[in-house]
């Protein structure tokens, strides 16, 4: 694996000079091998090690390099044709392979090669970009987007129109992460490498980036870039120091544990915020 990483790191340093016409065989094979490993879930751009999320920057570099070594090509899709550098994940799938891998794909859901989809996942008409990891039992609902290299945990529900930010455009240092057993409400956006920790509930229409203030009304604490585990979050505003205006924030209205979540439905958690 170290040899593979060395090839990627070396190629990335000269990425501006690499084209589909001049890329050498060793570099091309290394990049394609990494994309295959990401595609099967054997490698992840980010993973939790000893309780901390670690981003493997060299894998992200391989994803970026894949755009340098491939020309656009015509792709067939139902009644539509596409023209892009990255092939579709399911282009070569037959019924037996879909059954073996154990997830559902509702047309016209789109997944790029290099994204991993785990068993018992349901993809409604949605979009999953290259390098993303979607773990078991997750629902990606209609018009939701899982950005490049984003990490989605087990038993997550991404509601209709949710946007989970990627790392490629604009270039971000770390991927956005939604941990296990989270619910993200319709039309919410979580971007710029924000981590939503396990068991959190994000209400409809909440927007969280690295600069968004995440206000805990019980403690008065303000978080940036991280939603603490078990948080129930709604959109809100905080006043300026002189009270002349207010600015958007996300508000943690309560904390819940796994036992409470098991007894109370998501809608009930969001309704009883007082």
Curated annotation (Swiss-Prot):
GO BP terms: namely: diaminopimelate biosynthetic process; lysine biosynthetic process via diaminopimelate
Catalysed transformations (reactions) = (S)-2,3,4,5-tetrahydrodipicolinate + succinyl-CoA + H2O = (S)-2-succinylamino-6-oxoheptanedioate + CoA
Q: Which residues of the sequence carry a binding annotation for substrate?
A: 104, 141
Principal localization reads: cytoplasm
Q: Where in the cell is it found?
A: Cytoplasm
* CDD domains assigned to the protein according to its UniProt record, in alphabetical order: LbH_THP_succinylT (cd03350)
Source superkingdom:
Bacteria
GO cellular component: a single term: cytoplasm
Give GO MF terms, alphabetically.
2,3,4,5-tetrahydropyridine-2,6-dicarboxylate N-succinyltransferase activity; nucleotidyltransferase activity
Coiled coil segments of this chain: none
Q: Which UniProt keywords apply?
A: Acyltransferase, Amino-acid biosynthesis, Cytoplasm, Diaminopimelate biosynthesis, Lysine biosynthesis, Repeat, Transferase
Per the UniProt entry, the Enzyme Commission number(s) are: 2.3.1.117
Q: Name one Pfam family in it.
A: THDPS_N_2
Q: Which NCBIfam families does the entry mention?
A: dapD, PRK11830.1
What protein family is recorded?
A: Belongs to the transferase hexapeptide repeat family.
State whether it acts alone or in a complex, and with which partners, per the record.
Homotrimer.
**What name does the UniProt record give this protein?**
2,3,4,5-tetrahydropyridine-2,6-dicarboxylate N-succinyltransferase
């Amino acid at each position: 694996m170290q040899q593979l990483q060395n090839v990627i790191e070396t190629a990335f340093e000269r990425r501006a000079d690499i084209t589909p016409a001049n890329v050498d065989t060793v570099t091309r094979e290394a990049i394609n091998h990494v994309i295959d490993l990401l595609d099967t879930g054997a490698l992840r751009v980010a993973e939790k090690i000893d309780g901390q999320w670690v981003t493997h920057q060299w894998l992200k570099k391989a994803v970026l390099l894949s755009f340098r070594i491939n020309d656009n090509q015509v792709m067939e899709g139902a009644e539509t044709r596409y023209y892009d550098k990255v092939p579709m994940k399911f282009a070569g799938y037959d019924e037996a392979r879909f059954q073996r891998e154990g997830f559902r794909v509702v047309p016209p859901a789109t997944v790029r090669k290099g994204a991993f989809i785990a068993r018992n996942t349901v993809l409604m008409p949605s979009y999953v970009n290259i390098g993303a990891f979607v773990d078991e039992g997750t629902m990606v609902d209609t018009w939701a987007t899982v950005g490049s290299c984003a990490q989605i945990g087990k038993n997550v529900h991404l509601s209709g129109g949710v946007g989970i930010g990627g790392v490629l455009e604009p270039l971000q240092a770390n991927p956005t992460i939604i941990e296990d057993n989270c619910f993200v409400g319709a039309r919410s956006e979580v971007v710029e490498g924000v981590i939503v920790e396990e068991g959190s509930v994000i209400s409809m229409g909440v927007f969280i980036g690295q600069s968004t203030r995440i206000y805990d009304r019980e403690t008065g604490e303000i978080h940036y870039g991280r939603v603490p585990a078990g948080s129930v979050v709604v959109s809100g505003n905080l006043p300026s120091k002189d009270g002349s205006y207010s600015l958007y924030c996300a508000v943690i209205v309560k904390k819940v544990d796994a036992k409470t979540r098991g007894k109370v439905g998501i809608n009930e958690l969001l309704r009883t915020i007082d």
